[in-house]
C-alpha cells in the first residue's frame, strides 16, 4: 500500500487524466472528427487536415501512455491484491492482466495508425480520390472502431471491475 494519501491521490489523478485524454480523444475522433471530415472536406484537404491533427493527437497519446506506465506501476505494486507482475492467483490479477493486454493492443494499433497509416493517407489524399485512399480510410475507421469502442470500453470496464475485487 502507498501510505501517503497525497502521493496516492496524485498518482491516481494523473493516471485517470491520462486515461481520459487517450480514450476520450479516441471517442471524440471516431464519433465527431472523422465523420465530419469525411462529410465536409474534399479528399486532399481532408488528408492535410487529418495529417496535421494526428501530429498533435500523437503527442497526447504518447504522453498519456508514458504517464499511464509511470503511474500504473507503483499503483499496481501498492495494491493489496498484487502478487507479481504476471500472476493469475486472484480475480484482480486476472482482470489486470486482461486489461493490460488490451492496453498493449491499443498502443500497437495507435503506433500503426500514427506512424504508418496516417502518413499513407496524407500522401495519397494529396493526389486526389482513388480506390487506394478509400481502402486506407476504411482501414483507419476499422482501427478507430476497434480501439475506440471495443478495446477502450473493455479497458474502462475492467478498470471499474478491478476497483471492487
Give residue spans per PLM region.
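Polytopic transmembrane helical bundles with strong interfacial aromatic enrichment
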Residues: 1-165
